[in-house]
A protein has these predicted regions:
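Conserved pre-ATP/AMP-binding loop-to-beta segment of ANL
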Residues: 32-50, 83-84
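Gly/Ser/Thr-rich phosphate-binding loop
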Residues: 142-194
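AMP-binding/adenylate-forming core of the ANL superfamily
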Residues: 205-233, 262
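Conserved AMP-binding A3 loop
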Residues: 46-70, 80-82
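AMP-binding/adenylate-forming
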Residues: 63-70, 86-141
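Conserved ATP-dependent adenylate/AMP-binding module captured primarily in the ANL superfamily
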Residues: 1-29, 69-88, 118-130
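AMP-binding/adenylate-forming catalytic core of the ANL superfamily
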Residues: 226-274
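Conserved S/T- and glycine-rich ATP-binding loop of Class I adenylate-forming
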Residues: 51-54, 87, 102, 132, ...
């Protein structure tokens, strides 16, 4: 079992637990959390993860718990998360995004509120959260409730241009994430509410390109670099602008047109879904 896997300041729904009592409570109230905690606290140094298919066909892979802890610490440092901060997990625990929200809370000593995923997770809450993770779909249906969040990360797909305009200069710090299961969740964040266009690497991460596609180097997490299908404009080894997927490029008379870039431009002129 990795050191740092459980912070004694961790709370679930505002209540402190010993590790043993946490397992008993999770078993009674949230089976998926219980199953994850059983695996997280066993003697194995790894945990089984299911990939979403970003870098190929969906598959299962064994991930080192120490690497998940390091990823949580790097996110905490980047976003200045503090012990006792209230965090909301409204993502499924089947995949890396939901699992890492739990890991961040366990490692950093956050007060975690865990609810069933829905399109508007904040609707039933009156209290304010310091840290929340959404999908773009959840974000689009929760705009009116963003005042309940201090820092929000959004992953699983790009935020559309219409929503970005709404978010610009919002009091909530909203970040779009870039990453995948193989990199233990995100390795770069884009500060959307400040109008930023580029993703900025977390500590220990750097980037290169090959044929305009992003290559990821991640100290202590990746044993070898990952070559992606993401077309980017590389600003530096720490920053890039995401353009789209190379497998979505349209070849029109030998002119390469990026599907996502075209969609972003059209969304500024077309107000109805297309």
């Amino acid at each position: 079992m990795s050191s740092g896997f459980y912070n004694n300041d961790f709370k679930l729904n505002g209540v402190s637990y010993s590790l043993e009592s946490l397992l008993l409570t999770a078993n009674a109230v949230h089976y998926n959390l219980f199953e994850f905690l059983k695996e997280w606290t066993d003697k194995s140094s790894t945990i089984m993860l299911q990939t979403s298919g970003t870098t190929g066909l969906p598959k299962k892979l064994q991930m080192s718990k120490s690497k998940m802890i390091l990823s949580a610490q790097r996110t905490g440092a980047f976003l200045n998360l503090q012990t006792g901060d209230k965090a909301l997990c409204c993502l499924p625990l089947d995949y890396i995004a939901g699992k890492m929200m739990v890991v961040r809370a366990l490692v950093l000593g956050l007060d975690l509120y865990l609810i069933k995923p829905s399109k508007n997770p904040l609707k039933t809450f009156s209290n304010r959260f310091d840290f929340v993770a959404f999908t773009p779909y959840q974000l689009e249906h929760s705009i009116q409730h963003l005042g309940k969040i201090k820092t929000l990360i959004v992953g699983g797909g790009p935020i559309n241009e219409k929503t970005k305009k709404i978010l610009y200069k919002n009091e909530t710090d909203v970040y779009e994430t870039y990453g995948m299961t193989e990199t233990v969740s995100h390795v770069a964040l884009k500060h959307v509410s400040q109008g930023k266009q580029e993703f900025k690497a977390l500590k220990g991460v750097r980037f290169e390109t090959k044929n305009n596609c992003l290559k990821i180097f991640c100290d202590s997490i990746l044993t070898s670099p990952i070559m992606t299908n993401d077309v980017v404009n590389l600003i530096s080894e720490k920053r890039f602008v995401w353009k789209g997927r190379v497998d979505f490029v349209i070849n029109s008379g030998a002119i390469k047109i990026n599907h996502e870039e075209l969609e972003n431009k059209l969304s500024k002129a077309i107000s109805v879904p297309y």
